[in-house]
């Protein structure tokens, strides 16, 4: 497999970010709010942060730009994203990118954490997990976060169409209308078009083939776990004491969950 160089990787990541920003016009604002919450919520300059479903490292490097002393362990099961991140950010102090699948029990052991993590973060990734895998992942995550540890997840979280059919319909309609106003001629590059282009690049085609072999997105239809209520219920079941929305634009939300703090010794 030809070696992926840093400049090519950065070009592909820039193209990825551009494609994502068209689908998520408030992506940078959400990144900023998430990092604000990490900084404020952990209360230390060097929080140990887990980036779940890190992709090529878009969030991780923004975290390190703000908090250069924070060790960030990114994890993903996608070999293409990991190859891009490793080629682009090799040698970046504080950053580790780990190849693992959060659907597999015991996934957290592969992170080899030196201490309990202060925060776990994710953006536009955890909705890929089927509900039973999401619940198991949250339960395992709670075992590797320290007391008072945070989960911060930025994503499109939908309302329950059975419980709130009108609100759910309006929520979706507003997002679709905004998208049509911003891009009347359609997006310059769709998610699927980006992947088709990546598969045609000799420097990435081998990683794309490995992605297909692993069946990373087999059966994925984009709505496995998008309902807000599913995440809230799963997090409470996993032992998180507080769950709520910190930032929101339409159905684009930053969900925050907090583990109980240790009781003071008596």
For each feature predicted by the language model, list its residue ranges.
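Conserved glycine-rich SAM-binding loop
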Residues: 55
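A short glycine-rich, Lys/Arg-flanked "PGG" loop and its adjoining helix->strand segment in the class I
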Residues: 135-147
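Short alpha-helix
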Residues: 223-238
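Class I SAM-dependent methyltransferase SAM/SAH-binding core
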Residues: 50, 58-107
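Core SAM-dependent methyltransferase catalytic element
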Residues: 241-266
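Conserved class I S-adenosyl-L-methionine
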Residues: 1-45, 58-62, 106, 152-181, 186-190
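A conserved beta-strand element that flanks and buttresses the S-adenosyl-L-methionine
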Residues: 121
């Amino acid at each position: 497999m030809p070696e992926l160089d840093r400049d090519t990787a950065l070009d592909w990541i820039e193209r990825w970010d551009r494609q994502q920003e068209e689908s998520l016009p408030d992506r940078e604002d959400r990144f900023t709010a998430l990092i604000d919450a990490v900084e404020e919520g952990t209360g230390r300059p060097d929080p140990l942060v887990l980036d779940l479903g890190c992709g090529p490292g878009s969030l991780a490097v923004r975290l390190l730009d703000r908090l250069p002393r924070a060790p960030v362990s990114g994890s993903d099961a996608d070999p293409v994203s990991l190859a891009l991140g490793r080629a682009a950010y090799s040698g970046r102090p504080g950053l580790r990118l780990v190849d693992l699948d959060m659907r597999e029990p015991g996934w957290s052991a592969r992170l080899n954490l030196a201490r309990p993590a202060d925060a776990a973060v994710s953006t536009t990734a955890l909705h890929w997990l089927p509900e039973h895998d999401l619940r198991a992942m949250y339960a395992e995550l709670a075992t590797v976060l320290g007391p008072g540890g945070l989960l911060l997840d930025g994503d499109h979280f939908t309302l329950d169409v059975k419980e709130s059919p009108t609100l759910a319909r309006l929520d979706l309609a507003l997002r679709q209308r905004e998208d049509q106003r911003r891009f009347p001629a359609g997006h310059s590059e769709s998610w699927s078009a980006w992947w088709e282009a990546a598969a045609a690049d000799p420097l990435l085609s081998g990683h794309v083939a490995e992605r297909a072999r692993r069946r990373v997105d087999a059966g994925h239809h984009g709505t496995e776990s998008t309902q807000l209520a599913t995440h809230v219920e799963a997090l409470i079941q996993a032992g998180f004491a507080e769950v709520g929305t910190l930032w929101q634009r339409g159905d684009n939300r930053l969900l925050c969950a907090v583990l109980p703090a240790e009781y003071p010794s008596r």
